[in-house]
Design a protein with these regions (language model features):
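Core AdoMet radical
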Residues: 1-24, 28-31, 37
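Short acidic, glycine/serine/threonine-rich loops at helix termini
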Residues: 2, 41-44, 80
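Conserved short-loop catalytic and cofactor-binding motifs
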Residues: 3-6, 32-35, 86, 115, ...
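Hydrophobic alpha-helical scaffolding
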Residues: 5-12, 37, 41, 88, ...
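Active-site glycine- and acidic-residue-rich loops that bind
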Residues: 10, 35-51, 117-118
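Auxiliary Fe-S-binding modules of radical SAM enzymes
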Residues: 23, 48-52, 56-193
């Protein structure tokens, strides 16, 4: 799958080996999975199995993969759609199932992130009940998903409200998942891609 959708990039084994090396050097990484294009269900779980294996090999002192973020293929205007006719038919229910299965299948990766950017508020809220412990962040700059037409927009305040509506207390964090206090004035910051 990677050879088809990521031409010109390293192959899966090379990427996994880079992650292993990073973990041995105590460099924290994250892992993603874009799905809903040309892959099969079996290939999705092969992806998860490889991540679980790499995480199990990390040194005891290292965090390894600090988070796993599954996100749905955003097909608008992509070469993959034009040439391969790949179309994202992933439903919200299917995305929630992927979050739940990721939580079960990846017990050695502490944080599972719901991709509000690709699935929107309502689905991301359900994901918090299905095993996601991270809503994701407000990105200062995001070019990949937004270029493919992801329609979802939030302010810091609206993210906090959405998390509270789902029954959880929002917590600002660093990239290393350390808690931070919410700075003054950030509540109204509008992120528009």
């Amino acid at each position: 799958v990677r050879a088809i959708i990521s031409t010109g990039k390293c192959n899966s084994q090379e990427w996994l080996d880079v992650m292993r090396t990073a973990h041995r050097l105590d460099i924290t990484t994250s892992a993603t999975m874009m799905f809903g294009h040309i892959e099969t269900i079996e290939e999705r779980f092969e992806h998860l199995a490889r991540l679980r294996q790499v995480q199990s090999e990390k040194p005891a002192h290292a965090k390894g993969f600090i988070a796993f973020i599954p996100w749905t293929f955003q097909d608008a205007g992509t070469t993959l759609r034009k040439i391969r006719r790949a179309k994202n038919d992933t439903t919200g229910e299917e995305y929630v199932r992927m979050i739940a299965l990721s939580r079960l299948f990846l017990p050695n990766i502490e944080n599972i992130q719901a991709s509000w950017l690709t699935v929107g508020k309502a689905v991301a809220q359900v994901c918090l009940e299905a095993g996601a412990n991270d809503w994701g962040s407000i990105m200062i700059e995001e070019n990949v998903v937004s270029a493919a037409g992801a329609p979802h927009r939030f302010t810091s305040r609206s993210i906090q409200e959405a998390i509270r509506e789902a029954g959880y207390e929002p917590q600002l964090r660093t990239q290393q998942y350390e808690d931070r206090a919410l700075p003054e004035g950030i509540e109204e910051q509008v992120i528009n891609y």
